[in-house]
Curated annotation (Swiss-Prot):
Protein name per the record: Ribosome maturation factor RimM
Keywords: Chaperone, Cytoplasm, Ribosome biogenesis, rRNA processing
Subunit comment: Binds ribosomal protein uS19.
Primary residence: cytoplasm
């Protein structure tokens, strides 16, 4: 199974190093010297990590065969993909790999069906579940413990306790706003 572990950013210096946006909780395992990674786009790789270091809080990598700034710039925005055993699980029981969460059914605490996880977006502040509803629309659920209260891999579901307005249909939210305004005027 393949897992996106990083995205290559800008070139750093003139000797072929690049900045890397890490997308794994185990960078020392997945992004160490000697690691061979597939790429997206595939035509760029595979890439073998030659060296890695942290500079000003950013991970810098150099790949075999990339010796100058031009070569490094050509790699910009390339996704780095590691091969992962599908049975491998994170050490922390409250951590999950993307492939474990994909296609989970999402329900509220009271059992109301919301939809199915179709994508996980890794943003700087938090991860987001992209959930496809039965009508084909999408809703975005922040993957934070205050909202996602349970992940049950055996039952293939994620239980959420959404704040008002997070998953409500726009029409329902608009009608409750109108009702509240009417009551306030009375």
């Amino acid at each position: 199974m393949q897992l996106v572990v990083a995205r290559i950013g800008r070139a750093h210096g003139i000797k072929g190093e690049v900045t890397v946006e890490v997308r794994t909780d185990e960078p020392e395992l997945r992004l160490g010297p000697g690691a061979v990674l597939a790429t997206d786009p595939a035509s760029v790789g595979p890439l073998t990590i030659e060296t890695g270091r942290v500079h000003s809080g950013r991970l810098l990598l150099r790949f075999e065969g990339v010796r100058d700034r031009n070569g490094a710039e050509a790699l910009r925005n390339t996704l780095l993909i590691a091969e992962v055993d599908p049975d491998e699980v994170p050490e922390d029981p409250d951590e999950y790999y993307d492939h474990q969460l994909m296609d989970l059914d999402v329900v509220t605490k009271d059992g109301t069906e919301v939809g199915r996880i179709t994508e996980i977006s890794h943003l700087p502040s938090q991860d987001l579940f992209v959930v496809e509803r039965s009508d084909g629309s999408e809703v975005y659920i922040p993957f934070v413990e205050e909202i996602v209260v349970e992940i049950d891999l055996e039952e293939q579901r994620a239980v959420i306790d959404p704040p008002p307005g997070l998953i409500d249909d726009r029409a329902e939210v608009d009608s409750s706003d109108t009702e509240a305004a009417t009551e306030a005027d009375a």
